[in-house]
């Protein structure tokens, strides 16, 4: 649509300077907006020069040189307000596709560079390391490599030493047997309860473990008493008590005469 130019022209208006840009008329501004909208809706990459302008619609002052930098590359109008800021729909789609391809390629590169992905692609199995310290219940590893097993006696509220083993599995099975002896089938085991069904019944096993614990406690108490009596005061009274105790112990074993003579000969 072409609007007639009703603006009055002043004859005595001064000529614009060399560095002053050309001013667009309202008709030119409207044509620029319409062409830009048509360019966006149609989706064309390149737009032909606008044909709606006549030679008399463009006002060019006399002696004003043309500058190529002021001419729009889309609508070919000098002093355009922004045709270059509009993108065609197909250009936007291509730009989005390029961004998606870049993101996908970067993620694929990171995935291929990781050693876990390489191992999975090669058919290898990814194994998780098992914590050796907490591998079995009631088992601890000594600094020199062997494995020690112990269990807590629920009746006496004490720890029962089960021994030292070459492998962690042997120590774990020793713990399981002791746990079955204390708690029966309700015990928390390292291995299934079916593996121990052919073992000794639970009351007998519990009595054996309790007997071992009491025997070790009595031996340690006897050793401590003997050490106190031997290092006590060095008097005749302490020596006689110690000799009498040793004779009574030997008498219980059935060799009272020989042991008594031997002890008497030692202190004569």
UniProtKB/Swiss-Prot annotation:
User: Ranges of Basic and acidic residues compositional bias?
Assistant: 109-124
Q: Which GO terms describe its cellular component?
A: nucleus
| Span list, region Disordered | 97-139
The residues the entry assigns to the signal sequence are: none
Q: Does Transcription show up as a keyword for this record? A: yes
Source domain of life is Eukaryota
UniProt main location, coarse: nucleus
Keywords attached to this entry: Activator, DNA-binding, Ethylene signaling pathway, Nucleus, Transcription, Transcription regulation
Q: Which residues cross the membrane?
A: none
Compositional bias (Basic residues) spans? Answer: 125-135
Q: Which GO terms describe its biological process?
A: cell division; defense response to fungus; ethylene-activated signaling pathway; phloem or xylem histogenesis; regulation of auxin mediated signaling pathway; regulation of L-tryptophan metabolic process; root regeneration
Q: Which family does it belong to?
A: Belongs to the AP2/ERF transcription factor family. ERF subfamily.
Q: What does this protein do?
A: Probably acts as a transcriptional activator. Binds to the GCC-box pathogenesis-related promoter element. May be involved in the regulation of gene expression by stress factors and by components of stress signal transduction pathways.
> What subunit structure does UniProt give?
Interacts with MED25.
Q: What is this protein called?
A: Ethylene-responsive transcription factor ERF109
Originating organism: Arabidopsis thaliana (Mouse-ear cress)
Its lineage opens with: Eukaryota, Viridiplantae, Streptophyta, Embryophyta, Tracheophyta
Source gene? ERF109
């Amino acid at each position: 649509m072409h609007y007639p130019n009703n603006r009055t022209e002043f004859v005595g208006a001064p000529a614009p300077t060399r560095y002053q840009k050309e001013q667009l008329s309202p008709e030119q501004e409207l044509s620029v907006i319409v062409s830009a909208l048509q360019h966006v809706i149609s989706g064309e990459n390149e737009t032909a020069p606008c044909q709606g302008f006549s030679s008399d619609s463009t006002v060019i002052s006399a002696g004003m040189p043309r500058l190529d930098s002021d001419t729009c590359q889309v609508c070919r109008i000098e002093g355009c307000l922004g045709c270059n800021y509009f993108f065609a729909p197909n250009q936007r789609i291509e730009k989005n596709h390029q961004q998606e391809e870049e993101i996908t390629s970067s993620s694929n590169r990171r995935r291929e560079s990781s050693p876990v992905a390489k191992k999975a692609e090669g058919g290898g199995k990814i194994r998780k390391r098992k914590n050796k310290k907490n591998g079995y219940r009631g088992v601890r590893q000594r600094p020199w490599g062997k494995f020690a097993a112990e269990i807590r006696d629920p009746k006496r509220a004490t720890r029962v030493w089960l021994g030292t083993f070459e492998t962690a599995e042997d120590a774990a099975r020793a713990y399981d047997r002791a746990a079955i002896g204390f708690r029966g089938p309700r015990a928390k085991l390292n291995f299934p309860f079916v593996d121990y069904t052919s073992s000794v019944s639970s009351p007998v096993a519990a009595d054996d473990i309790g007997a071992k614990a009491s025997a070790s406690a009595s031996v340690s108490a006897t050793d401590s008493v003997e050490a106190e009596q031997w290092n006590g005061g060095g008097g005749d009274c302490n020596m006689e008590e110690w000799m009498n105790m040793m004779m009574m112990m030997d008498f219980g074993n059935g060799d009272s005469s020989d042991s008594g003579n031997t002890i008497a000969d030692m202190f004569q």
